[in-house]
Amino acid sequence: MSTELIAAVEAADSAEGLVRAVAALSAARTDAAIPTLISVLAFNNPGAAVVAVDGLIQLGSPAAQAILNNLDDYNYGARAWALRALAGIGEPAALPLLLSAAREDFSLSVRRAATYGLGRVRWADLSESDRLAQQQQCYETLKLCLQYDPEWVVRYAAAAALETLAPAATQLQSAIAETLNRQAHSDEERAVQARSRLAERRLAAGV
């Protein structure tokens, strides 16, 4: 069955046909689909890429490991989609990549995806000592992105990620709230101010 579904993706001869074929393959939820779903991320078909990302997220850790082993260093579009999948999976093994991409990647779409992912890590998969150290790194990177990234969409993502990081990183909640408060009053973009203010308000209310 999976062989036929994979063949259908490879044989698709239209954008709509590719989306349908990828959707069918994703719905099968089989690890055999992972290489093909990853390859779709490099196609110039955003609709198919969205479906492939969703399929990879459903497959979890095996998909994350495959993405990490096959990351496209040259196609920034494929890299951004791959990081969106990693963000959705929350795989702790992806943390080094997410941290470096959030800080250093030239592509704003990659930085935004990586920043978003730093707030969605499966912290329960790490030991307490590793968890505390990695959460500190995430906070410092997100703070850097929130304050200094030149693209407002990345700063917006950083504010959202700090909000989702805070409940798991109780030792950092005061620092996170202070960082959000500062940005709510200083960012040049009103959308970032508003998102920072919303995150701070939700944290204060325990939402």
From Swiss-Prot:
SMART domains per the UniProt record, alphabetical: EZ_HEAT (SM00567)
Assembly and binders: CpcE and CpcF associate to form a lyase.
Signal peptide range in chain numbering: none
Domain of life of the native organism: Bacteria
Family: Belongs to the CpcE/RpcE/PecE family.
GO cellular component terms, semicolon-separated: phycobilisome
Main function: Required for the chromophorylation of the cpcA gene product.
Xref: SUPFAM superfamilies: ARM repeat (SSF48371)
UniProt keyword terms in alphabetical order: Antenna complex, Lyase, Phycobilisome
Pfam families, per the entry: HEAT_2 (PF13646)
Family annotation (InterPro entries): ARM-like, ARM-type_fold, PBS_lyase_HEAT
Stated name of the protein: Phycobilisome maturation protein
Molecular function GO terms recorded: lyase activity; oxidoreductase activity
Transmembrane segments: none
